[in-house]
């Protein structure tokens, strides 16, 4: 019987299935960070349980670490406590960890793939909702709660119910100026933030196959924003080439065996999906969110929508509340919206490809950050991304134009460290969520691609980067 990619991943990890369909899944890799792991480790200690498979875990501090000078440590006592607690727990249990001043430190969903700890065919979990990122490698990856983190530490298994299968198929050549971020925002705009509820989404089609691994990670990262349990892309030569030579990857004869196995993780011809959604890549244009949900998105050449034209009273009410929070007027051209701050970073868009794309726009415009922009910051996704960008001179491109070049971390994506918006400030952000207060109490977030964020920094408002050539 023909199987989908999700079917193969699920079936190859089932330990036991109950009569109600609940399955005990084996977990190959758990990624840990400082926010959702302390209570899990505390539970182990209280029950006097060991970590079942130490080598299956990899830890890093990312949410609370400062992105400015780290020579004096962490000033905020709560943030410091969380980071110190992770350090102590990993030391006590012998878990591999990249500490704050390790060059390999970075955002958990960036360091996993770049270290080769994320591999095709794996089940991967983390106490973080954007764990779906790792599905770009043909893996089953999703976020879990703190009690589940403890369960995986203790047993290397997890109780789950199988999701339905969805295929999101994107065909054709992506127009100039459009990126993976625009693809996934267009998908969410089409199906809504509840469109993927109850599903695991496989992203396929010629447009997805043409993406780099960085681009595929961006798309899978935001599968959760479409309501899906997980997002994934089939394994191909692009996947294998990315993984070659990375620290956690098999070598020698084991590499050859692994590649042969990895390449089986694709949907079979004739595999049945519960839902299929199709997009024409040629119709995708640079996207900008206007509201307080990722589904509240439109094109750069569009306008802020008018709630009066929405027939559904529930949606109309949500639109009105979003516009009030965002301080936007219906029918305002998107290009007329001015911004106060720029954030280029996050587990969605802080890889070397993203940094290069933003730097290209800055060089092309050849001007400094606009006077009305109070802060434009670039936060690389890891110490290794930062070092690579600096070898290429990209840091100088940004700093000479008036951007701040920071240390790696989650930063302004969720404002758990000192990087945040003040009430009423408007930000062009390459992150994944534009909820009320996400980047700071009263802050107003517009989600865009790195190139779009860079252009907004220089112009002081949103601009159509397709005009840049």
Curated annotation (Swiss-Prot):
One of the Pfam families matching this protein, by short name: Aconitase
E.C. designation(s): 4.2.1.33
Subunit description: Heterodimer of LeuC and LeuD.
Necessary cofactors: [4Fe-4S] cluster
Reaction(s) catalysed by this chain's protein: (2R,3S)-3-isopropylmalate = (2S)-2-isopropylmalate
Family: Belongs to the aconitase/IPM isomerase family. LeuC type 1 subfamily.
Superkingdom per UniProt: Bacteria
Gene Ontology terms describing biological process: L-leucine biosynthetic process
Entry protein name: 3-isopropylmalate dehydratase large subunit
Positions with a binding annotation for [4Fe-4S] cluster: 347, 410, 413
